[in-house]
Swiss-Prot record:
Subunit structure, as described in the record: Part of the 30S ribosomal subunit. Interacts with proteins S7 and S18. Binds to IF-3.
Keyword DNA-binding: no
GO MF annotation: an example: rRNA binding
Family under the similarity heading: Belongs to the universal ribosomal protein uS11 family.
Top-level taxonomic group: Bacteria
Stored PANTHER family: 40S RIBOSOMAL PROTEIN S14/30S RIBOSOMAL PROTEIN S11
Biological source species: Clostridium tetani (strain Massachusetts / E88)
UniProt record, GO biological process: translation
Record-linked SUPFAM superfamilies: Translational machinery components
Protein name: Small ribosomal subunit protein uS11
Main function: Located on the platform of the 30S subunit, it bridges several disparate RNA helices of the 16S rRNA. Forms part of the Shine-Dalgarno cleft in the 70S ribosome.
Keyword terms: Ribonucleoprotein, Ribosomal protein, RNA-binding, rRNA-binding
Pfam family, one: Ribosomal_S11
GO cellular component: a single term: ribonucleoprotein complex
């Protein structure tokens, strides 16, 4: 029987980048909110989503869930030295303003807020209206 060599895979520790200015991309849909903090080139420093924090079902789409996601992502990015962000908001969800306020409350200086929601030039057919 051949001896199987067990090579231990060492996980590289995340090095602390020293980035002071960056971007916050907030994607707020009807079902979830995702907050990604990047440097100015677009390389992700940290991200968090409402679903990833344990919110499930209808609680996932609340402003409070978006606030918690933004707070979690901001704390992780501030470990890399992030101080000020430009905020780009995408989507029609309820967590847009809550996420921006949460970034400010976490200690990040918001220098710009821009809505980058994609608007179709009569592209795909929208989902049918709900009859409740």
């Amino acid at each position: 029987m051949a001896a199987v060599s067990k090579t231990k895979r060492t996980r590289r520790r995340k090095e602390r980048k020293n980035i002071e200015r960056g971007c916050a991309h907030i994607k707020s849909t009807f079902n979830n909110s995702i907050v990604t903090l990047t440097d100015t080139a677009g390389n992700a420093l940290s991200w968090a989503s409402a679903g990833g924090l344990g919110f499930r079902g209808s609680r996932k789409s609340t402003p409070f869930a978006a606030q918690m996601a933004a707070e979690t992502a901001a704390k992780a990015a501030m470990e890399h030295g992030l101080k000020s962000v430009e905020v780009y908001v995408k989507g029609p969800g309820s967590g847009r303003e809550a996420a921006i306020r949460s970034l400010q409350a976490a200690g990040l200086e918001v220098t710009l807020i821009k809505d980058v929601t994609p608007i179709p030039h009569n592209g795909c057919r929208p989902p049918k209206r709900r009859r409740v």
